[in-house]
A protein has these predicted regions:
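Short glycine-rich or small-residue beta-strand-to-loop segments that form or flank ligand, phosphate
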Residues: 83-90, 112-115, 131
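N-terminal glycine-rich anion-binding loop in soluble enzyme alpha/beta folds
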Residues: 4-68
Length: 183
């Protein structure tokens, strides 16, 4: 059974890696200084971080809509895929996974939606995705790849070590006193 792999734009792949691994991406939207961009489509990571560094406020993101995922899943079904493994940013960080689950219930293709909860986002999810793509290319079934993805995601750790606490202060995650004490 051939299956597709779908991620959101928090997965830490370049455009070249998406293409080489045959991974399909549904972008989140980012809002910076009043402008909205489709993440990794209309703005690169480098452009995002540059604009964030020069912004007075903190950028915001919004999840893809269920319709965005429904379009992706229907397109994959039309292309002949019989199933999909979709791995997304942790549900505690974003509503992206709920949009994906809602869409999965509306389409005529077997979609397995996985929460990158322990992985959080980015590189940890990318490592799991790369492994299941390798399995897919070697003939693994959807069930086998799903089991491996769950195993890898359960082992993942997500740590953050920011160079500066400025954005945590701007976003209200830390108080001025906490930032001062951490310095």
């Amino acid at each position: 059974m051939s299956f597709a792999v779908v991620v959101d734009s928090t997965c830490d792949f370049t455009q070249e890696e998406y293409k080489a691994l045959d991974v399909h991406m549904v972008p989140l939207s980012v809002l910076i200084d009043g402008e909205t961009f489709k993440d990794q489509v209309e703005i690169t990571s480098e452009q995002f971080y540059e604009r964030m560094a020069n912004s007075e406020g903190l950028p915001q993101s919004s999840q893809p809509t269920p319709y965005d995922f429904e379009q992706m899943y229907n397109t994959l079904a039309e292309q002949g895929y019989e199933g999909v493994i979709a791995i997304h940013i942790a549900g505690v960080l974003s509503g992206t996974i709920e949009s994906s689950r809602t869409a999965a219930e509306q389409v005529d293709i077997d979609v397995r939606v996985l929460d990158g909860a322990r992985a959080g986002a980015t590189a940890s999810i990318a490592l799991a995705v790369a492994e299941i793509c390798k399995m897919r290319d070697e003939g693994a079934t959807l069930d086998e790849a799903e089991a491996k993805a769950k195993e890898l995601l359960a082992k993942a750790e997500f740590l953050v070590a920011p160079e500066t606490l400025e954005n945590l202060l701007k976003g209200g995650r830390l108080s001025a006193d906490q930032v001062k004490n951490a310095s």
